[in-house]
């Protein structure tokens, strides 16, 4: 019997999301206009809380849908205007170009990145050294490339290797269901479980590595570019400005990587079983023999394009998004990717998040129009200039650990800039606050998958169920990094940021605009 019209509409609304989630969103949409009639300020904060809720529930439904519905309603009832949303989007066009073109550009360099991580995995036998290598490689790549792409590449390597061994363990060459362990005998299951633990730890080290590297440069994370633009910094300026905090934090993060592996804490320390290594090495040897001259040329070309990318970013030869577009053009032209559909696949990863970011800007417009953060900013600005840095760092960190970094970073840098333009703080203090906001937004966010887009991407990937990486386990494995990075970052903001920045100015390396 066919279901009723009402039931069909209910099932279609937000698709496979739980009924309680659908009901919650409908209640939000009904309550918001009523509260807005009574108190626009309270309604604005309620909208922000609801939006953060949709981000926290990203595994139930992609936030673009519920967040977008809330944003559309906010414009309709007058919390902000469509014109203000357009202004916010226009002001952050560089970030949208970064997401559209840079992420797509790196897609065409995946073969090179896969080659790098495969060589690391099979060449280094020491687990401590391998973990450190993955963390450092992910950090370096994320300083110039998109963190999601770096994690996507590591996931591709892990899924590929897991599939190779799973087929051997199940004695089925055409094993397509990697989650089915029913054909694997007891001995192989023990080895497979050890292999899962090994892959889990490597994925977490790589994920944290993207956060360590991503905070250091203006292209490492989307919010970095927003902050750099607001402060008027180019690539080199941004790196030097952040270095009093980011360099010590990077060292602390790498030491944490070695420590948890050495002491086997928090689920780390599992080594690659020798039987698995033999199978993977045999497969890699066969792959290398089958690699044609055309394949080798592709790798060389991608490496040269990588050098161009780093050089163009460092010298600020063009806007970041346009450099990304040049990477797309060069990579496709020189590696023979000419089909429209093949090129189109490169954009599937970035465009949903680009649309979500536009929704972020709608909520930011509401925050500005309703002056929601004015009381918090007034409270922070009443403190001494030195205390302001730590307070901004802490407030950013708390919100970033449960919400999206781009959203949080955009809100706080806008408020700090408004305070500077009104004369509440000096330009010099504003530049120090920009560093506190950027590091506070990036570092504590490793606490949960909600805070780090790369972690959320890993959690929702095909790899997570294969290696038994749940939300709770990810939070637990991230805990030592969360504590170390957050505390180290706070101490650096408190004690090293101002004096080292002053020394850089005296040396003539940086200057206040």
Curated annotation (Swiss-Prot):
Q: Its biological function?
A: Na(+)/H(+) antiporter that extrudes sodium in exchange for external protons.
Q: Tell me how this protein sits in the membrane.
A: Multi-pass membrane protein
Q: Where are the transmembrane segments?
A: 23-43, 52-72, 97-117, 120-140, 144-164, 202-222, 238-258, 303-323, 348-368, 391-411, 447-467, 475-495
One Pfam match: NhaB
GO CC annotations on file = plasma membrane
Main subcellular localisation: membrane
Enumerate the UniProt keywords alphabetically: Antiport, Cell inner membrane, Cell membrane, Ion transport, Membrane, Sodium, Sodium transport, Transmembrane, Transmembrane helix, Transport
Q: Where in the cell is it found?
A: Cell inner membrane
Task: Give the family per the record.
Answer: Belongs to the NhaB Na(+)/H(+) (TC 2.A.34) antiporter family.
Is Cytoplasm a UniProt keyword of this protein?
no
Q: Does Protease appear among the keywords?
A: no
Q: Name the catalysed reactions.
A: 2 Na(+)(in) + 3 H(+)(out) = 2 Na(+)(out) + 3 H(+)(in)
List the Gene Ontology MF annotations in alphabetical order.
sodium:proton antiporter activity
The protein's name? Na(+)/H(+) antiporter NhaB
């Amino acid at each position: 019997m066919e279901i009723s019209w009402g039931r069909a509409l209910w099932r279609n609304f937000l698709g496979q999301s739980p009924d309680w989630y659908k009901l919650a969103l409908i209640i939000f949409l009904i309550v918001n206009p009523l509260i807005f009639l009574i108190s626009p300020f309270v309604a604005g904060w309620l909208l922000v809380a609801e939006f953060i809720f949709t981000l926290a529930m990203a595994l139930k439904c992609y936030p673009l849908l519920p967040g977008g519905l809330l944003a559309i309603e906010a414009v309709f009832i007058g919390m902000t205007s469509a014109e203000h949303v357009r202004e916010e989007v226009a002001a952050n066009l560089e970030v949208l170009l970064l997401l559209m073109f840079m992420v797509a550009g790196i897609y065409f360099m995946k073969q090179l990145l896969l080659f790098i991580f495969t060589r690391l995995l099979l060449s280094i036998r020491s687990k401590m050294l391998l973990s450190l290598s993955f963390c450092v490689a992910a950090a370096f790549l994320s300083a110039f490339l998109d963190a999601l792409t770096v994690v996507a590449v590591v996931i591709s390597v892990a899924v590929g290797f897991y599939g190779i061994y799973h087929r051997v363990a199940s004695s089925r060459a055409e094993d397509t269901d990697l989650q089915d362990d029913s054909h694997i005998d007891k001995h192989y299951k023990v080895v497979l479980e050890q292999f899962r633990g090994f892959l889990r730890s490597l994925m977490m080290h790589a994920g944290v590595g993207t956060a360590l590297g991503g905070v250091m440069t203006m292209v490492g994370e989307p919010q970095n570019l927003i902050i750099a633009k607001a402060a008027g910094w180019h690539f080199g300026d941004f790196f030097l400005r952040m270095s009093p905090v980011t360099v010590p934090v990077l060292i602390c993060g790498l030491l944490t990587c070695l420590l948890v592996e050495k002491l086997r804490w928090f689920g780390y320390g599992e080594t690659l079983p020798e039987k698995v290594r033999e199978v993977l090495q045999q497969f890699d040897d066969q792959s290398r023999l089958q690699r044609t001259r055309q394949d080798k040329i592709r790798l060389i070309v991608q490496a040269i394009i990588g050098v161009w990318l780093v050089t163009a970013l460092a010298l600020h030869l063009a806007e970041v998004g346009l450099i990304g577009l040049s990477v797309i053009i060069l990579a496709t032209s020189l590696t023979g990717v000419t089909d429209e559909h093949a090129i189109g696949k490169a954009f599937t990863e970035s465009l949903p998040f680009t649309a979500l970011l536009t929704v972020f800007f709608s909520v930011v417009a509401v925050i500005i129009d309703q002056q929601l953060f004015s009381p918090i900013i007034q409270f922070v600005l009443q403190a001494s200039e030195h205390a302001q840095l730590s307070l901004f760092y802490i407030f950013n960190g708390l919100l970033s650990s449960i919400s999206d970094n781009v959203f949080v970073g955009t809100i706080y840098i806008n408020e700090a800039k408004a305070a500077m333009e009104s004369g509440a703080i000096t330009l010099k203090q504003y530049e120090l606050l920009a560093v506190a906001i950027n590091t506070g937004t990036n570092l504590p966010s490793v606490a949960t998958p909600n805070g780090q887009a790369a972690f959320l991407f890993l959690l929702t990937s095909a790899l997570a169920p294969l290696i038994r990486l749940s939300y709770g386990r990810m939070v637990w494995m991230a805990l030592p990094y969360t504590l170390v990075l957050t505390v180290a970052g706070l101490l650096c903001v408190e004690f090293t940021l101002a004096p080292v920045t002053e020394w850089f100015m005296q040396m003539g390396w940086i200057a206040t605009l």
